[in-house]
């Protein structure tokens, strides 16, 4: 029995999968399985000390919030969300006074992503104001204290990349009307560092192209537009979902499923949309040796059963 509770690699990811699969049928095996998993999670959630998305408090909070918003569970978990918010807030405030090492920089970007998501969900004006102040402090600190290799590609490919995540979350903060002049100034300053980057890996060119295109659209900056065109020409869309990833690379965080998620996110906010042959993508997913290994390798199954694995792909 897996003792991990987390969103991407633990029980909460599986819990969400079974609730969604149940189609709200309370008599179904999927619903009952989800309900049992939720009981196990709630019993142990207070013991979680890490705050990351994978297996920590931020992932648990967002997962429980999703279940409540979609009426899979009652709002009785609201007290847990409040406690989790308070815990993350305290940790986040501490990081503002810390000298963040290069390897931990994504950790701070993740906190910013979490706070922006929660800002959209919070109803309490006092908590919303605290969250807003933290968002302003965090994004400025991240930008001003970024490491020298911040404008570089992630190898191997992952959608959970600090540069891509930071650009996406800046766009969302701007969309909310928060510090728009400051963010536009950051986008302008970024040009001298970012525009020399054309990633080696095709999936990295694709993800940078998507987020840069959104920046170009909101800023209406001709230089951003030119950079986007250069990236677009360098992306092999034909081979992106079929040839660029090795057979097992179908996971949501660092595989084909993740690239599809990025496309949906882009289409949601963009003035134009990208379309791919989803049937070909589905064939590619189904033909992967991932499924055979998942059935035959117990250690592999335990590692990849949750949202960044079986449940997320399904």
Language model segments and positions:
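Glycan-recognition and catalytic cores of secretory/periplasmic carbohydrate-active enzymes
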Residues: 1-314
